[in-house]
């Protein structure tokens, strides 16, 4: 659906190459080689998908790219959100793990999006979000300090990607994720039991 010029552009080609390498284990050297679909050799869990979405390009660590500006990886300057879903027969129990800025710099926070979106992160109604998906209003891209997402974007934009503290920060991110994820399985089990009697 894209012309060859766009498919071959480094900013598009590199992130596809990185993702397909993580999914298939193979390195594709041309945009024309990328498969349209594959049968995975294993089941991908939440952590596998998060790992793919957090991928950086070796070109991103080139000298001078202090603030992750080149963006040849999957996690790039224009990635302001990233979501991984775990589907369930009952839509109320669909789980989401969401970052509010670059996934390589911020934690995935667990939530149940169809149970009720967290008011702190939902600045559009479902209807507005669906309508704006392909026809967004210009003001949706304007800086608004009252939108919680901007606190995360401000932080991501101030992280010096080349600084040694970047790796330390990511250890903190993983530690926070572990803490946030700890009660999930027990909470889900309890919620499903309660749903049987409600």
Map each language-model feature to its residues.
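C-terminus-biased signal that marks the final domain/tail of proteins
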Residues: 1-198
């Amino acid at each position: 659906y894209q012309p060859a010029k766009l498919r071959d552009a480094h900013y598009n080609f590199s992130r596809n190459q990185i993702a397909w390498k993580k999914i298939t284990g193979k390195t594709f050297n041309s945009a024309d080689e990328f498969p349209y679909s594959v049968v995975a050799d294993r089941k991908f869990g939440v952590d596998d998908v998060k790992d793919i979405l957090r991928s950086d390009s070796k070109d991103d660590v080139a000298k001078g790219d202090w603030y992750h500006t080149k963006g040849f990886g999957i996690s790039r300057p224009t990635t302001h959100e990233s979501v991984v879903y775990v589907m369930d027969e009952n839509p109320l129990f669909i789980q989401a793990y969401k970052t509010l800025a670059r996934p390589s710099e911020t934690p995935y926070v667990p939530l149940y999006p169809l149970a009720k979106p967290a008011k702190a992160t939902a600045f559009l109604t479902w209807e507005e979000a669906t309508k704006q998906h392909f026809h967004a209003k210009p003001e949706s891209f304007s800086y608004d300090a009252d939108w919680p997402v901007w606190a995360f974007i401000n932080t991501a934009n101030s992280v010096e990607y080349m600084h040694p503290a970047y790796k330390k920060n990511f250890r903190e991110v993983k530690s926070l994720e572990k803490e946030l994820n700890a009660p999930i399985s027990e909470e889900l089990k309890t919620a499903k039991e309660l749903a049987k009697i409600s």
